Amino acid sequence: MYQRIHFISGLPRSGSTLLAALLRQNPRFHANMSGPLAGLFGVLLGEMSARSEFSVFIDDAQRQRILHGLFEQFYADTSAEVVFDTSRAWCARLPALATLFPDAKVIACVREVPWIVDSIERLVCNNAFQPSSIFNYSPGGTVYTRANGIAGPDGMLGYAYDALKEAFHGEHADRLLLVQYETLVSDPRRALQAIYDFLGEPAFAHDVDHVHYDAEAFDAKAGTPGLHAVRPRVEAKPRPSILPPDLFRRFENDAFWRDPQLNPRSVRIV
């Protein structure tokens, strides 16, 4: 690729859309919300695997060229010098990404886990008449069944959390920068400076008081208006949780990245 490519990944409801909205203020950068590339990547891997009778005609070098070409063609019309592709799945693909893009880095957005669950439940409550794609458009359930669903190994949160731990403890952890939601909204300039330093990019003066991002059509189709809403001004807005106290406590010790003893690879965290 003629562009440099990096990845935004991490946990849901942790600021990845806000981060993309900020990064795209830089005319040299292209960034967006979660897109289809990670899914296409997985499909291609599956179709080139031994489950296909034609896999005998495909070796690893061809697989790599095909997957590399997927990125080249997807971003062929993008004039930006630096591309950021977003998906929670990228943390689980670091060995492949390291081979395809030796200079690529991954920015993983994280947040205190009970507030992720709280944020998803708040979306459900705010859209009481529109079942969400997050729960396969099912109108039933309670806050407890919804929390169990997203926290399960294949759930919106559980999969991303496990993928993050895989990347955090894996051999390519040096490619990883964790950006805490709490830092991003309370001190966005410090978070952005850390990202630019991590990527080796020249500084850019971002306007954190006038941020714009529009995904209303996508969110409406997902039955979850507000899913990718970004406030014009980046700021921390404390609020009480709407989760039952016992459910909140269930997740409040899950921020493993905050314990230095659990960071043997010295992953950078801002």
Question: Which sequence ranges carry the predicted segments?
Answer:
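PAPS-dependent sulfotransferases, especially Golgi type II membrane carbohydrate sulfotransferases
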Residues: 1-6, 150-153, 158-174, 189, ...
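Conserved nucleotide-binding/hydrolysis micro-motifs of P-loop NTPases
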Residues: 36-38, 112-116, 184
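PAPS-dependent sulfotransferase catalytic domain
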Residues: 60-77, 118-198, 255
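Glycine-rich phosphate-binding loop used to anchor ATP phosphates in small-molecule kinases
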Residues: 70-96
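Conserved phosphate-donor/acceptor-positioning beta-strand/loop module used by diverse small-molecule
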Residues: 86-89, 97-123
